[in-house]
Amino acid sequence: MPKRNDIKTILVIGSGPIIIGQAAEFDYAGTQACLALKEEGYRVILVNSNPATIMTDKEIADKVYIEPLTHDFIARIIRKEQPDALLPTLGGQTGLNMAIQLHESGVLQDNNVQLLGTELTSIQQAEDREMFRTLMNDLNVPVPESDIVNTVEQAFKFKEQVGYPLIVRPAFTMGGTGGGICHNDEELHEIVSNGLHYSPATQCLLEKSIAGFKEIEYEVMRDKNDNAIVVCNMENIDPVGIHTGDSIVVAPSQTLSDVEYQMLRDVSLKVIRALGIEGGCNVQLALDPHSFDYYIIEVNPRVSRSSALASKATGYPIAKLAAKIAVGLTLDEMLNPITGTSYAAFEPTLDYVISKIPRFPFDKFEKGERELGTQMKATGEVMAIGRTYEESLLKAIRSLEYGVHHLGLPNGESFDLDYIKERISHQDDERLFFIGEAIRRGTTLEEIHNMTQIDYFFLHKFQNIIDIEHQLKEHQGDLEYLKYAKDYGFSDKTIAHRFNMTEEEVYQLRMENDIKPVYKMVDTCAAEFESSTPYYYGTYETENESIVTDKEKILVLGSGPIRIGQGVEFDYATVHAVWAIQKAGYEAIIVNNNPETVSTDFSISDKLYFEPLTEEDVMNIINLEKPKGVVVQFGGQTAINLADKLAKHGVKILGTSLENLNRAEDRKEFEALLRKINVPQPQGKSATSPEEALANAAEIGYPVVVRPSYVLGGRAMEIVDNDKELENYMTQAVKASPEHPVLVDRYLTGKEIEVDAICDGETVIIPGIMEHIERAGVHSGDSIAVYPPQTLTEDELATLEDYTIKLAKGLNIIGLINIQFVIAHDGVYVLEVNPRSSRTVPFLSKITDIPMAQLAMRAIIGEKLTDMGYQEGVQPYAEGVFVKAPVFSFNKLKNVDITLGPEMKSTGEVMGKDTTLEKALFKGLTGSGVEVKDHGTVLMTVSDKDKEEVVKLAQRLNEVGYKILATSGTANKLAEYDIPAEVVGKIGGENDLLTRIQNGDVQIVINTMTKGKEVERDGFQIRRTTVENGIPCLTSLDTANALTNVIESMTFTMRQM
């Protein structure tokens, strides 16, 4: 069937900011889809609110709108652009929900917009729990015993019929938002009320738990001629009961018999045909390990996290082909881009094993609730490819960057066996490592199986890993055993530990005896057809398939899994760097291990190595490819941390030299530089012990900011007010040492300013200066940033420009530099300097049309900025006002305090742009999920130090018609100024404020921290209750002021004469 000619313009909806459950996989899918549609000759309009994505680059679509993904804003774009069609299945759950809302409100019909791909009725049939269950019953496909509820009372009725445990699944949500497993009445009440709150349809499915069944997924494709294929099937190592995004996954499935595999394959295809899916679709099934009984759990009628994994696991580009199916092409007429000879209707075959392990944020949120269930908690994931299951698992473990390199914990010896077993009996993010620890202590596999329900096949593989450890210990230095361990994915570091050698000695031993990996191609067809994809993985076998060319090469290190503090912004920079390398005539090679991203799409670079980002794995590639040099400044802290180790092997680090990278991080050297170039910084010292830190603080004066050196995303950073807090920090939060000193700085309150610049060694260009709305002390990644600055004087701007140029030249920066300043009462001070790409690079690149990462890469190759037409200093300002607003995923993470401080907590960002600051802020806040209303009720409970400041704020909110609730202390302060406020009781008292929040009486909460334990606990409960009820809670008065400005601009002020 030829493609459709009756449509010319297609609107694609992106997935918005990165949140838990919806990460970079949709940037990858959206980018592929837009390019595929353009390739077929359609005009593509894209709307997405996330500026940190490749898909929002002007080259990807014909028109790009970075606007909030709400019904009203998309409706405006539809009315303005008049597209012929809308493709909603590539923007995750956000895109689907938007399509449904636009359909129901009549916007699509009024503007003659057709929906492409899967029909709306099919989407609703798959997403609406009631309709789905009915369809399954008609098809005779078993679903778990279940009931649809719209109220908590109905849930209790169902519980009386079937008993516990019960699984709650809210309709039309993603990442399991609001869902969970209930074991008792209290949990049932809490989870169902939460689920009804998060479901746009106020509907939950309650099902009898089948926890303990195997969880199997099939990624399938279908076209309008009813051709349907299975792209990939995957098995969750964790049994049913843990969200698939939080499960360790293997592809292809390892424990199914052929009969089981074919049975589940047939069911998956039967279901997608019955639903009439056109495009990609993910089917999740549960299989009883002891019989042929199975249940269908759910169907996602769209491109998903699993389809990104399936695409990277097989090399089969699901999103690209799904977009083409949506415009009428069929599987049997599209070539498979990997082989270039076989058609897309051939099912991929794998001759390797894939392991995916989720990346959790608990290294940042140590107090977070770690227990895993049906609600997703991982921020990202890693994937590894091997020829044995053990090899792929161990490669994936060392890709995670938890400081864990093997199946066990660094301090594993210190736990007693009872504690280890206790940890295994709970499903959490560390269970895998505790299982390794238990096997090491001789626990039987039977006992572990009974505790976890993990299939014996996998437990035997874990046992094999531990057995090899013992063999290495018994045959220290034996080459046969070294080779054998390498076949099963052991790292040099792990072998060194068992051989009683250093990692470097094991590396040298391998080199002398020619024990090196070869690189195999990922070709979708197990080498049955000719294939020329430049997509490789390393393994210890004989034949190397990665042909080294004569061209000069540059190797770019990616940024690994998405986590808080290191998001998709770094992938954006990596991709742009690769494009610049290719334009300059070099061969570009990427090393990365994140299956969700654009950088690991094999069509982006000349060669892609899907490998862990460790010294050993990267050196193996460098030894084969012998690149001109390695670029580390675009891969976040992951890549920067490898620079030292690679340089020791004689590898050339391109761009800013290693010595200068270290000068920016080393306290004493950096201070010496600042004195030399005459740039002030807050008074500070470094401490290598608690005693030294106390002496430093006494000299500098409280409050002080304390943090470890060499970290990203402000990990373990705190503002402390006295000796007791400082002692606490030094003994609990960090292990200070001469190699890793702790920095103690004077805490200056003032405006925080962020600047990104590019330097070629001679010229420094500054694309833009951003002002933060929150004063210094809130991590820059969690602050609202505004471009251009709104409140700075000409003198301050000139000083910022001068200091930035001095710093970039003083550090001999070649490439990018990011600097944070604070403007305090008496001048501009530099807070920190990062000699690398930063979180704000995509944001500024979009605003100014200056392709910052590409210019930086060209400077690294040796081109001059003046030859490219740029003058030194701040570049001309773009028209309009732009804000970057942070987006948090607190509703997915229990027990995490949402107070903003120097440690980063946001998972993503949105951009708001308009002609005035208030309008841009309105868009930024709306896009980040804060509903801005021009009237309502605000609850204020602030610490004593903020009471004076909150008066003015209360007065303004009162004048625009907001009703004020306040706790007694705050209310008394407001009464002094004749501002009316209703007094609410403290937690547990009369007219308790938590009850008022839960009853929906409050639209905004303003709550600032009070130090001191009891109050902190109250404050923590208040903040968590707001999150669980979906109410914006502002913990910084600066954010509250900005929101008030927006409210004032939307409404009229009522003041008596």
UniProtKB/Swiss-Prot annotation:
Task: Please state the pathway this protein functions in, per its UniProt record.
Answer: Amino-acid biosynthesis; L-arginine biosynthesis; carbamoyl phosphate from bicarbonate: step 1/1; Pyrimidine metabolism; UMP biosynthesis via de novo pathway; (S)-dihydroorotate from bicarbonate: step 1/3
Sites where the protein binds Mg(2+) 3: Q820, E832
Q: Which residues bind ATP 1?
A: R129, R169, G175, G176, K208, I210, E215, G241, I242, H243, Q284, E298
> Which residues of this UniProt protein bind Mn(2+) 2?
E298, N300
Extract one GO BP annotation from the record: glutamine metabolic process
Instruction: Identify the domain of life.
Output: Bacteria
Coiled-coil regions listed: none
Q: Which cofactor does it need?
A: Mg(2+); Mn(2+)
Q: Which family does it belong to?
A: Belongs to the CarB family.
| Protein name in the entry | Carbamoyl phosphate synthase large chain
* Species per Swiss-Prot/TrEMBL record: Staphylococcus aureus (strain JH9)
Whichever gene encodes this chain, its name is carB
